[in-house]
Amino acid sequence: MAKFLKYGRVVILLQGRFAGKKAVIVKSSEDGTKDRKFGHVLVAGVERSPKKVTKRMGSKKIQKRTSVKPFIKYVNLNHIMPTRYSVKELCDFKELVKEDKIKNNAKSEVRDTLKKVFVEKYRTINPEEKSASHTKFFFSKLRF
């Protein structure tokens, strides 16, 4: 059977604190590892998505409303739902989110760098690009 939970795939988390939030697969381990003996993925996602901005808003308000709060988490394969979207071009997640950094309690530093990258990418979405709809979907709030 083909593996479809690959790097860059957008997934929706189904269980836990971040249930209903969108995330991107950074690393997939379908057979498990020594630490986690079950199939799991390392995801980087958006905990708080940016809000709508209008022309009448000032620059400070726009800065505040376009902020993104990211998260990093290991998730069991049973607790994710893959989508048809893929955002490999968003940034190089493998360089930003490394497992040794997460294990060495540098998770907050990784989260800060992710926040900077996510905010910068969100503010510079080009609607003419082919992958713009994928990026727009990733940063939008899931309505249900």
Swiss-Prot record:
GO terms for biological process: translation. It comes from Tetrahymena thermophila. Transmembrane segments: none annotated. GO terms for cellular component: cytoplasm; ribonucleoprotein complex; ribosome. Its main location: cytoplasm. PANTHER family: 60S RIBOSOMAL PROTEIN L27. SUPFAM superfamilies: Translation proteins SH3-like domain. The lineage of its organism: Eukaryota, Sar, Alveolata, Ciliophora, Intramacronucleata. This is Large ribosomal subunit protein eL27.
